[in-house]
Amino acid sequence: MAFLILVTLALASAHYSGEHFEGEKVFRVNVEDENHINLLHTLASTTQIDFWKPDSVTQIKPHSTADFRVKAEDILTVEDFLKQNELHYEVLINNLRLVLEGQFGRQVPATGHSYEKYNRWETIEAWTQQVTSENPDLISRRSIGTTFEGRTIYLLKVGKAGQNKPAIFMDCGFHAREWISPAFWQWFVREXIRTYGQEIHMTELLDKLDFYVLPVGNIDGYVYTWTKNRMWRKTRSTQVGTNCVGTDPTRNFDAGWCKIGASRNPCDETYCGPAAESEKETKALANFIRSNLSSIKAYLTIHSYSQMMLYPYSYDYKLTENNAELNALAKATVKELATLHGTKYTYGPGATTIYPAAGGSDDWAYDQGIKYSFTFELRDKGRYGFALPESQISPTCEETLLAIKHLARYVLQHLY
């Protein structure tokens, strides 16, 4: 038994060490003009770089910053290039391995589900069954499809049983490495269960609304971040003619598909796929929403990082018909979020606020007629990026819950 425990601990320690990222750094470069953008294009064409923000070198804009991860063997080359071309930069993360190890509160993550820890998919899957069986009056679970690798895509419905209730659809985990996203929706479900019948606002919301919650949108990719590559972003689909794996699910919806801010190269992180809704994961979500359009009044998709609340459009610079309303609602929502911990969010249309990107689920949902459609980019602003430590799960989820409740109350008061 002692030997088994030691082996288990050793395996866990090896997995969570982030050893593949030893010596890797994350840089932030100040981008002032088109010349700086061209220089970063040159750098990206000669060196393997993982862009964190924006998603791709093609989305860098003047008067902004670019965050990217560099492998240990390329660091000297990159630093020399930045210095020689007088590009001002800072190192956000000096050794990614250490930051990844530091994500966890202790060396070996807790067994079983925890709302204040990052959970493996197998744990989340079991949790969905448990919360459903323990709270049948508030929660039900259904399958809406399977992933490329054959995993069941579960959807939770949270709300007091009732006929013809309006609904809000909420998803997370479409980008596999954004672990704080699935952590939030688990927190949301917990708070709904815990405070129903005790806290007036949550009780009213669950009495009058249904919340469709997709715990992890990109399950295959999420599993891969736990078993092979913590920084994986895309799905895990394969196709004929390339050895490169995966499609960016947030470039795969039929909303200006592959028109701007997306790539047709299967090896790129923003690959839009061979066709709109080519991915089983995006198709499952789209089919469910299409089948329930009459009841779904808002669509929310949760990502990280950069502390932003975005609304359509991202595939075009045009404004929505209800832009003024969406802007006012976003302003009020991020103000509510900031009341707890003082966390500041930027808000606005996706294309102008962050960068243009076609094929996003929020734009697609809006074009389906869901006029309250938003993307949340949770903490932080780059100190940890995708490696947000578990110590920040609670404050992140607490403040985001305030925002979601505020937005949901508005939707309830403005049904259409």
From Swiss-Prot:
UniProt keyword annotations, A-Z: Carboxypeptidase, Cytoplasmic vesicle, Disulfide bond, Hydrolase, Metal-binding, Metalloprotease, Protease, Secreted, Signal, Zinc, Zymogen
InterPro entries: CPB_M14_CPD, M14A-like_propep, M14A_act_pep, Peptidase_M14
Keyword set includes Glycosyltransferase: no
GO biological process terms, semicolon-separated: proteolysis
Cofactor(s) the protein needs: Zn(2+)
Enzyme class per UniProt: hydrolase
Cysteine pairs bridged by disulfides in the record: 244-267, 258-272
Annotated active site: 377 (proton donor/acceptor)
Compartment(s): Secreted; Zymogen granule lumen
Family from the record: Belongs to the peptidase M14 family.
PANTHER family assigned: CARBOXYPEPTIDASE B, PROTEASE FAMILY M14 CARBOXYPEPTIDASE A,B
Record-given protein name: Carboxypeptidase B
